[in-house]
Amino acid sequence: MNHFLACDVGGTKTLLRISAAGEGEPLLQKSYPSADYTGLAEMLDDFLREAGTSSVAAACFALAGPVSGRRVKLTNLPWEVDADALAARFAIPRISLINDFEAVGHGIAVLQPDDLLTLQPGAPQAQGVRVVVGAGTGLGVAWLSWQDGGYAVHPSEGGHMDFAPADATQYALLQHLQQHHGHVSYERIVSGPGLVAIFEFLRDSGRGSPSAQLIAAMGEGDAAEALTRFAQQGDEPIAQIALDLFVRVYGAFVGNLALIALPRGGIYVAGGIAAKIAATMQRGDFMRAFHDKGRYTGLIETLPLHIVTNPQIGLLGASLAARRMI
């Protein structure tokens, strides 16, 4: 029986799914901590061994980084993925490497209504341009345009555009980050590591002091997750200030993308962070920054805006792409 393999490689975790052609449910789906492996081939060995099959007709790998040709160096992980080497090692005749947000773009087609939280219904246009954007370990962006009876997905590295501060605090944040990185992209701020960078800026510039409990929580595990959790609990001012600043920059960035693409088919905010802070994004600062486009605020208000709440959208998109190759 023909099987197809889908893989969504992220800086924090990697999702793998193998399915039989013509069947609905996957044979096996697993999540692996990316940092536990030295490369993708080692992880695939473990996964296929557990799946109990070595017969894979097609595979699609969604990767966080620019994809050009058959070999990709990941942006937020010390891995290089070589499609031809994987094809030879695992006897997979058809392998596709795509950008992780290209996979998210494909995944939009198979989302269910309860996979979306609508922030702004707007005035959706059938076959209109769509944008997918999302912060996680990095900041991904892709466009979708209607071509030949369906949506074509266009990957980008839009998260690496220059950060443009909107007020004095953001300008001070820019100067702080320039001391560490030189060039400051939106990804330096709108990402998990970016939220931590905002916290460090606030702390180092005397704009807030963390409690001993927050310091301990950040040191014990995922620092960005700890900041988010403490901010949402409402009893840690520096975490709240950091998250509020984060969503303002996030909203402004998404608004910039809206002006560039005029996505009358909708803007879909995916990634690992948005669904976890949806209440904060609904509260006001995100939407105010999204709308704050001067003479074009009225236009921005007509564009549909959704949060994708299904964390597996990239895997769903990669699976759809792999199925099409059989």
Task: Identify the function of each model-found stretch.
Residues 1-54, 172-326:
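ATP-binding/phosphotransfer module of carbohydrate and carboxylate kinases, centering on a glycine-rich
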Residues 4-8, 56-60, 96, 130-134, ...:
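Short glycine-aspartate micro-motif
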Residues 32-34, 74-78, 96-102, 122-125, ...:
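Active-site nucleophile and cofactor-binding loops and adjacent substrate-binding regions
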Residues 51-115, 132, 275-279:
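Short beta-strand-loop/turn "lid" adjacent to the catalytic site in phosphate-handling enzymes
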Residues 112-121, 322-326:
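Short, electropositive alpha-helical surface patch
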Residues 115-187, 278-279, 285-291, 295-300:
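Glycine-rich phosphate-binding loop of actin/hexokinase-like ATP-binding domains
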